[in-house]
Amino acid sequence: MAPQNMPAVSIDINMFWQIINFLILMFFFKKYFQKPISKVLDARKEKIANELKQAEIDREMAAKANEETQGILKAARTEANEILLRAEKKADDRKEAILKEANSQREKTIKSAELEVEKMKKQARKELQSEVTALAVNLAEKMINEKLDSKLGANLLNVLLKR
């Protein structure tokens, strides 16, 4: 094949007009669309930044609320334990008071029973003494009336004492 002669620098006219159209398009884009698109992009960027800040604030508030909740829960547990301890102490005190009262009542009952027994003993002694006196008088009358000898009187006295 024969070498073709080509110009050293050749510019295609279609390419030239495409470049001109591109530059005109860039000019109109920059003049009419760049600011609104930049505003929309900046607004979106600012909105995302604000949402991230708000998310961080919300996370911190949630952490703080969690700490407060844990503190309140701990305080409630402590208070519940204190209430239980006070209730147990009160129950123990009440138990002690009831036992003390029961012991006191028992002691009173025992003393009352002892006094009653002592009173009954005294009463029995008085009755026995009066009965022995009556028997002795009766025996003495019989001894005088029958004029018994001393052996018979001693035997009667022994029989009388055995009763």
Swiss-Prot record:
GO MF terms, alphabetically ordered: proton-transporting ATP synthase activity, rotational mechanism; proton-transporting ATPase activity, rotational mechanism
GO cellular component assignments: plasma membrane; proton-transporting ATP synthase complex
Coiled-coil intervals: none
Membrane topology: Single-pass membrane protein
Keyword Ion transport recorded: yes
GO biological process: sodium ion transport
Keyword terms, alphabetized: ATP synthesis, Cell inner membrane, Cell membrane, CF(0), Hydrogen ion transport, Ion transport, Membrane, Sodium, Sodium transport, Transmembrane, Transmembrane helix, Transport
Record InterPro entries: ATP_synth_B-like_membr_sf, ATP_synth_b/b'su_bac/chlpt, ATP_synth_F0_bsu_bac, ATP_synthase_B_chain
TM ranges: 9-29
Subcellular location: Cell inner membrane
UniProt miscellaneous comment: The ATPase of I.tartaricus is of special interest because it uses sodium ions instead of protons as the physiological coupling ion.
Listed NCBIfam families: ATP_synt_b
HAMAP family: ATP_synth_b_bprime
Assembly description: F-type ATPases have 2 components, F(1) - the catalytic core - and F(0) - the membrane proton channel. F(1) has five subunits: alpha(3), beta(3), gamma(1), delta(1), epsilon(1). F(0) has three main subunits: a(1), b(2) and c(10-14). The alpha and beta chains form an alternating ring which encloses part of the gamma chain. F(1) is attached to F(0) by a central stalk formed by the gamma and epsilon chains, while a peripheral stalk is formed by the delta and b chains.
The family this protein is said to belong to: Belongs to the ATPase B chain family.
Function: F(1)F(0) ATP synthase produces ATP from ADP in the presence of a proton or sodium gradient. F-type ATPases consist of two structural domains, F(1) containing the extramembraneous catalytic core and F(0) containing the membrane proton channel, linked together by a central stalk and a peripheral stalk. During catalysis, ATP synthesis in the catalytic domain of F(1) is coupled via a rotary mechanism of the central stalk subunits to proton translocation.
Descriptive protein name: ATP synthase subunit b, sodium ion specific
